Amino acid sequence: MDDIFGDIFGNFFHQKRQQDGRAFARKGADIQANLHITFEEAAFGGDKIITLTDDNGQAQSLKVHIPAGIDTGNTIRLRGKGSLGTGGGENGDLLLHITAGSKTGYERKETDLYTTLQIPYTTAVFGGEARVQTIHGDVICKIHAGIQSGSQIRLKGKGIVSMKNPSILGDQYVTVQIPVSYTHLRA
């Protein structure tokens, strides 16, 4: 009984597919791959050449645009760069799953960056200025007299650009550390 239905429906679909002499167009499969990028590539974006092996085992170089602000867990879709379609169907897509590297001294939380800054005890007591490294270059930061170890200084617009809205920059939060030497503790 299954064979009868199989023959009837199989022939029906076979005839339907072959009516105009062609098979139905079928989109190629999407290909998934991991792409490791540097902290700087994630923060500032840019183009990167990657090499992949195609369906025929041939190495293929592709230029990939990395949008500024991308982060680990995001995906870049390259339309038409996946497996070949059949019957005139379009090619599948290449999905690149991003893993962004880290940078010593920086912690990233979305578009904001967190760093630490050691200042001398005398600067903490009397105030002054300190040079702070940012991904956009060094800045001079005002240190208020009496600042406490663990205090945070916000550097507005010194973080990472928002991938969703490139006109928005995150902030850099600098946690002040005041090393205490034993000479300052003597009574």
Where is each model-derived feature located?
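Intrinsically disordered, low-complexity linker/assembly segments
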Residues: 61-186
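Post-J-domain flank of DnaJ/Hsp40 co-chaperones
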Residues: 1-55, 86-91, 95
